[in-house]
Amino acid sequence: MTSVHSLGFPRIGHKRELKKALESFWSREIDEQELQSRAAQLRDRHWRIQQTCGMDLVPVGDFSLYDHMLDMSCTLGAIPPRYGFAGGQVGLDTFFAMARGSATQPAMEMTKWFDTNYHFIVPEFHEGMDFRLSSERLFDQVKEVQALGLKAKPVLVGPITYLWLGKEKDLNAEAHHDAQHHHDDSACHGHGAPIGAACFDRLTLLPKVLPVYAEILARLAEMGVEWVQIDEPALALDLPQEWVEALESAYQTLRRDKTPKVLLATYFDSVADHAKALKALPVAGVHLDLRRAPQQLNSFLSDYPADKVLSLGVVDGRNVWRADLDAALELLQPAHKQLGDRLWVAPSCSLLHTPVDLEQETELDAELKSWLSFSVQKLDEVAIIGRALKEGVESVAQELAAARAAVASRKSSPRIHNPAVAQRLEGLGQDDGRRKSPFPIREAAQRARFKLPAFPTTSIGSFPQTPEIRKARLQNRKGELSNADYQKAMEAEIALVVKEQERLGIDVPVHGEPERNDMVEYFGEQLAGFAFTRHGWVQSYGSRYVKPPLIFGDVSRPTPMTVAWSKYAQSLTQRPMKGMLTGPVTILQWSFVRDDQPRERTALQIALAIRDEVRDLIDAGIGIIQIDEPAYREGLPLKRKDWGHYLEWASRAFRISAQIAPDDVQIHTHMCYSEFNDILPAIAAMDADVITIETSRSQMELLDAFATFNYPNEIGPGVYDIHSPRVPSVEEMVGLMEKAVKVVPAERLWINPDCGLKTRKWAEVTPALENMVEAARQVRARHG
């Protein structure tokens, strides 16, 4: 009988219970026992939901208090020495120090999980390191599931993906870090090592890590586990041949008489290039993402082994649109005919990337709601498909008819298409969005206008969102606080932020964005073609959740979105106030995007809307405007052969949004969590006057490419990690800037934090910015 299953379920809870529990624990309002109790309640509820939806197997180990890659590091005992782990079981103090930093040690690096908006904690590897089983978490959770009478399917990050996504570290540099609080070229990665780094190949650690995987599988077998899901999404990347060969040897090594059956799960793109190898592996099944890469199916159906199941992901685990069940069944028919009961049906990937339950959305209009599907509904869709295959389409005729009607409604709705937007797009023609003058002319005009000191200081945009700010916003939404009183409250907060920046001596202040709930949602709420949920939260990292807008139709800007706030802030200071906008690619990447037209077309629609806002800010006297693009790299296709087209339209969308700016208006952009050394030409093609980037966690590693690539414009490398509560010292920030000066001309450097300060407390922000301004003074004295 065809099995239906889930690759993973959201951790956060229907009402963001995990976030509330974590933040209560971090602020010492609850103890570890209470935190673990609340986590267990969430897991119990999520497993029961999946059972109710009809899943034959429920995933175990997909739940994490912070990040599943961090869980894997702890399970394998891969704890960087700087955290003082003495062996045994990894405790929560060590776990959270690795994720968030501590009073004396910075956090581990964090980066995007493939091309999603989820972030994982990057494993650190050093030459000769040992691995050992150091966490009972997975086994404890298997016992929890078994106590419920459910069939557990433990989920592990596979050894190839785990090693590939990590970074090599030089322990000598780490020892220096312990003494000086900064690395000296301590990381090297398979995509090109920093200058001077002492490197080894992390693939050489595979023989050391495999025995721990084997031990885990043996323990699970002893517990009566029949199936284990081992995720190898790295296979969707352009893996070097030696890594592909390592995959084959690794799974041969893990083959044992008494181990559970292994379902090797791939997702996010095609793995057709590895079809022959995957079919030959000693595993009991393979999972394919047919939403991202339906064309790969034929490569697997050809000569698919008779002793393997084939799990096919036909319900989109990364977007919110209701599935076309007829199309899914049509796609599955050849596989079902060939494989019979050996065909399994699942979402394309873990449902980590979609909101929990559409039924919570009681305020969405009926038509739009009928087009949507969240995690619970996606499992229902998987179950319907499974029943259709097992019992025939007649058994689910009513469900199929409802899905068919929703798909037809969405295609024909007049809410989707706006002729005026189409006309503007056609008017662009081949215009690539170039500004009037090249950068050297613009730079001279901007320096004459603003007269900033060497190494000017600024922040990235947001300041702490205090409970008072959130309360005022909530009261305004509920109608308990009038718009006029809400405006007064926000203006008071803006005045406080501007005054504090003046006191600190920040050269280019910002208004702090108290009025913004989220850097994408805020704009989407004011753009036509967008819709919003009340409970559509997804995890970004740790306790940081986002509520992406839904882009369901053509995008346009009916009225100005930020002008009044920026104009008010500028009236409070003689310093140049920086206007703050979110760029078209980031709005696209951090939204749930319509799938009925190319993403490129939607991005250009957003770019034109942002350009309208830039024009109005300039008319209001704002001379420095930041157009954030932190998700620029995130949009890169996983395979390099597909990069060129994406980079071309993504850079063009940014340029079109900024094109209206005259020479003496300075356009900034910001990119956080980005590793973009290999796409610097495309970054330069965006032609922002100033780019600020996240560099402190990677200890300025991102700047290494500037030694060989003569980046033409100005740059602000982040000098402290805002994702950690730790306050960096003046010396630490001076040290980072000294590294920057070695590769970027001093006259082109800015000094700023890594990212916005929204999630931090004032008690952390004020001393950190004081130290940053003092660091700028010291660097100016040396180089200015």
Curated annotation (Swiss-Prot):
It catalyses: 5-methyltetrahydropteroyltri-L-glutamate + L-homocysteine = tetrahydropteroyltri-L-glutamate + L-methionine. Catalyzes the transfer of a methyl group from 5-methyltetrahydrofolate to homocysteine resulting in methionine formation. InterPro entries: Cbl-indep_Met_Synth_N (IPR013215), Cobalamin-indep_Met_synthase (IPR006276), Met_Synth_C/arc (IPR002629), UROD/MetE-like_sf (IPR038071). 5-methyltetrahydropteroyltri-L-glutamate binds at R16, E17, L18, K19, K112, W590, E634. Its cofactor is Zn(2+). L-methionine binds at I460, G461, S462, E513, D628. Binds 1 zinc ion per subunit. L-homocysteine binds at I460, G461, S462, E513, D628. Its EC number is 2.1.1.14. This is 5-methyltetrahydropteroyltriglutamate--homocysteine methyltransferase. Pathway: Amino-acid biosynthesis; L-methionine biosynthesis via de novo pathway; L-methionine from L-homocysteine (MetE route): step 1/1. The active site is at H723. Belongs to the vitamin-B12 independent methionine synthase family. GO terms for molecular function: 5-methyltetrahydropteroyltriglutamate-homocysteine S-methyltransferase activity; zinc ion binding. Keywords: Amino-acid biosynthesis, Metal-binding, Methionine biosynthesis, Methyltransferase, Repeat, Transferase, Zinc. The gene is metE. Zn(2+) binds at H670, C672, E694, C755. GO terms for biological process: methionine biosynthetic process; methylation. The keyword Cytoplasm does not apply. HAMAP family: Meth_synth (MF_00172).
